[in-house]
């Protein structure tokens, strides 16, 4: 079956959602040789994935993940496709902490660095924040601390079947886009950083089919897969089955536009140091504004505020009042979660 679908791709034809789901199921179950996986990933990257293919691939990944039920907690995820090559500090991770300090329930999905200098798991280790290892720990952390970190390999063990091939290929594949759409909690409220507006549009259409509630897909024109504090950001907003596209600049919400170099770090350790100084109100303004903008997005999609600008005000207050730093200290304490068990 896989070979027939591969031949279909070679003929330049696209796959239906059902066919894409079948391909992903076979890949996730270790039924496909590495050479054939490489072939289909290369073909799809060259011609671009269709919305139906993305929908099917996401369903296939979800069929094979270790899911966690957090529907009653109404969680939000802040996750990016990664690979922007900008070597910035972990903006989405810092933003998740701020949003959780502001009362948003966050289930942050992430991994170690692949092409970047610091993955979300790497910086959390340097911040001494405990990474939960099972469903009970995750539920307790979200309920008691408003935040849990979902380390992707624990919930997507079947990805081991493509890890070596992805590394050998050395370029972005559909899996970069699929990761943020396959949160183990099946959350429907997200902020997803992507590397291009074209991809954002495709993912938005796929998210409508997959049942998203409220999602912001963001692509900074400076190349960041975040809401940019240094340039204009293209935004594709999904609310139910309604898709809206617009741009956002820092000055639109009364924030100063900064320089990209103010966001660059050497490694996970320096990323953690910048985040800690930011929460102590000692960082540069650009770093602070980057976190404010992305925190505001998470607060907005959570439904805790009605507009993005209201989210900015809440994020600013959360950082400047010291609430974000207090939350950081709470997240560092394993005893809070362990006691809840």
UniProtKB/Swiss-Prot annotation:
Binding site for Mg(2+) 1: 92, 226
Record-listed Mg(2+) 2 binding positions: 225-226
GO biological process, any: L-tryptophan biosynthetic process
Catalytic activity, as annotated: N-(5-phospho-beta-D-ribosyl)anthranilate + diphosphate = 5-phospho-alpha-D-ribose 1-diphosphate + anthranilate
Cofactor stoichiometry and binding remark: Binds 2 magnesium ions per monomer.
Superkingdom to which the source organism belongs: Bacteria
Chain residues that bind anthranilate 1: 80, 111
Enzyme Commission no: 2.4.2.18
GO CC terms, sorted: cytosol
InterPro entries for this protein: Anthranilate_Pribosyl_Tfrase, Glycosyl_Trfase_fam3, Glycosyl_Trfase_fam3_N_dom, Glycosyl_Trfase_fam3_N_dom_sf, Nuc_phospho_transferase
Sites where the protein binds 5-phospho-alpha-D-ribose 1-diphosphate: 80, 83-84, 88, 90-93, 108-116, 120
Pathway: Amino-acid biosynthesis; L-tryptophan biosynthesis; L-tryptophan from chorismate: step 2/5
GO MF annotation list: anthranilate phosphoribosyltransferase activity; magnesium ion binding
Keyword check for DNA damage: no
Residues engaged in binding anthranilate 2: 166
Keywords: Amino-acid biosynthesis, Aromatic amino acid biosynthesis, Glycosyltransferase, Magnesium, Metal-binding, Transferase, Tryptophan biosynthesis
Cofactor: Mg(2+)
Cited function: Catalyzes the transfer of the phosphoribosyl group of 5-phosphorylribose-1-pyrophosphate (PRPP) to anthranilate to yield N-(5'-phosphoribosyl)-anthranilate (PRA).
Subunit structure: Homodimer.
Family: Belongs to the anthranilate phosphoribosyltransferase family.
Name assigned to this protein: Anthranilate phosphoribosyltransferase
Organism annotation: Priestia megaterium (strain ATCC 12872 / QMB1551)
Gene behind the chain: trpD
